[in-house]
Curated annotation (Swiss-Prot):
Residues 5-38 form the WW domain. CDD domains: WW (cd00201). Residues 27-44 have a biased composition (Polar residues). Residues 1-15, 87-100 have a biased composition (Basic and acidic residues). This is Putative PIN1-like protein. It comes from the Eukaryota. SMART domains: WW. Residues 1-52, 69-100 are annotated as: Disordered.
């Protein structure tokens, strides 16, 4: 079976969280693809389109980025907000907070 054969250098098999499908990722050059890479090309097949873009986004580290932005804006997690915290609310959320 092809999955049991050794992958080319730099490639590893991963599982898509949303779909549960296996995909291949090259941690040296960073392409991701559904098809198993062959040993004779750097990309090894078709690069993701459509649904796989969601897979890539699902691996973003959203919480650390948000925490860094909050700290840069003067909001410290243990202080419950900082200067202008209400100004960054979505307009609908800000209206709810003001009782509108």
């Amino acid at each position: 079976m092809a999955d049991e054969e050794k992958l080319p250098p730099g490639w590893e098999k991963r599982m898509s969280r949303p779909s549960g499908r296996g995909y291949y990722f090259n941690h040296i050059t960073n392409p991701s693809q559904w098809e198993r890479p062959s040993g004779n090309s750097s990309s090894g097949g078709k690069i993701w389109q459509g649904e796989p873009a969601r897979v890539r986004r699902s691996h973003l580290l959203v919480k650390p980025v948000k925490a860094a932005l909050d700290l840069a804006a003067g909001n410290h997690p243990d202080q419950g907000g900082g200067p202008g915290a209400d100004q960054r609310l979505h307009p609908e959320d800000q209206g709810r907070r003001e009782g509108l």
